[in-house]
A protein has these predicted regions:
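A glycine-rich helix N-cap at a beta->alpha junction
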Residues: 54-82
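C-terminal structural segments of small proteins and small subunits
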Residues: 92-116
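Short, glycine-rich nucleotide/cofactor-binding loops
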Residues: 6-19, 47-53
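Short internal beta-strands
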Residues: 25, 36-42, 75-80
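Histidine-anchored nucleotide/phosphate-binding helix
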Residues: 18-33, 38
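Short glycine-enriched, charge-decorated loop/helix-capping segments at active-site entrances
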Residues: 51-56, 92-95
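Extreme N-terminal starter segment of soluble prokaryotic enzymes
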Residues: 1-5
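Ligand-binding beta-strand-loop-alpha-helix segment within the catalytic cores
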Residues: 78-81, 86-88, 94-97
Length: 122
């Protein structure tokens, strides 16, 4: 079975990247594959902010990530440089998320069989 790592650099509500990521990851897990981690880069780190204001009629992306990662024991990390640039603090993150550098992400990617990237597209 394959080992997957996901990389996401899109904001929570601009695209459906997180929704798509979770559905792909669920399908991979169902087939017996492993998810080694989900790394948030650039403005994608905003996906990790637990106190995001989305109202009652919009899905809560950070909550979806937290629930999925907790239920499946998947590491979730935000790029330390981008966390600093955006002014986020690690205590503002969803439960289980951490702040990691690109070196840590590189180790995840090297150990993975598949790297799936969700970016802004261009």
């Amino acid at each position: 079975m394959a080992k997957y790592v996901f990389f996401i650099s899109t904001e929570p509500y601009k695209y459906q990247a997180v929704d798509t990521l979770i559905e792909i990851a669920k399908a991979a897990l169902k087939k017996g594959h492993e998810i080694s981690g989900i790394f948030f880069f650039g403005t994608g780190v905003y996906n990790l902010k637990k106190e995001i204001s989305c109202g009652n009629s919009i899905r809560n992306i950070p909550e979806k990530i937290e629930k999925f990662s907790r239920e499946n024991n998947i590491p979730v990390a935000g790029c330390s440089t981008w966390v600093s640039i955006t002014g986020l603090k690690e205590h503002e993150f969803i439960e289980g998320a951490s702040e990691e550098g690109l070196g840590d992400f590189s180790n995840w990617a090297i150990d993975a069989d598949k790297l799936i990237v969700f970016g802004t597209g261009g």
